[in-house]
């Protein structure tokens, strides 16, 4: 199934029967990449794979591997595994448009697309809400390897686009973290 947005094929869905492993759907997409849909897949931003009871999404990055497929969750981190629950939120016109237009990042260094995971999406949304509607402070907590740099980059990028925001500062407590963050930001967007 291909979803067109403004006439462009931006989302491709691979559906399998109940009981079929999701990795089969993922592998099918990889075969399509290699043998069938070269031109079409140049436009696709997101892939969805489902067997009805398990549903995952991932960015169009043929070198990413199955480990970069993710469950969608609600803001309380409850997964939407069932296709109908996933579709109800994810394919809502506003949500799908927002995910594609704001929450996919081209990693310039690796020349690959990255899509934020649900907790990153909700964290950035809460940061934007807080900046727009409050003068109170706040914090976002991530564990090691959870994508803190990508979350902070996307939050800084979107906050900087808000009216009345002239500068976004990123404060770190170690020199090596400053170097690492600057390098990653530069890979996400040169000059960031």
Where are these regions (language model features)?
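ATP-dependent helicase/translocase motor core
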Residues: 1-191
């Amino acid at each position: 199934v291909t979803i067109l947005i403004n006439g462009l094929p931006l989302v491709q869905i691979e559906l399998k029967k109940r009981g079929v492993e999701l990795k089969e759907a993922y592998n099918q997409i990889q075969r399509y990449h290699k043998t069938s849909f070269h031109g079409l897949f140049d436009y696709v931003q997101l892939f969805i794979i489902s067997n009805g009871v398990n549903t995952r999404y991932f960015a169009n990055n043929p070198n990413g591997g199955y480990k970069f497929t993710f469950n969608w969750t609600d803001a309380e981190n409850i997964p939407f595994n069932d296709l109908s629950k996933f579709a109800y939120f994810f394919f809502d016109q506003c949500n799908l448009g927002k995910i594609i237009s704001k929450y996919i990042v081209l990693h310039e260094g690796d020349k690959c697309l990255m899509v934020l995971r649900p907790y990153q999406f909700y964290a950035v949304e809460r940061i934007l809400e807080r900046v727009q509607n409050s003068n109170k402070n706040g914090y976002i907590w991530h564990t090691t390897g959870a994508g803190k740099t990508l979350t902070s980059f996307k939050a800084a990028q979107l906050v900087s686009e808000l009216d009345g925001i002239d500068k976004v500062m990123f404060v770190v407590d170690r020199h090596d973290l400053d170097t690492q963050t600057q390098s990653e930001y530069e890979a996400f967007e040169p000059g960031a």
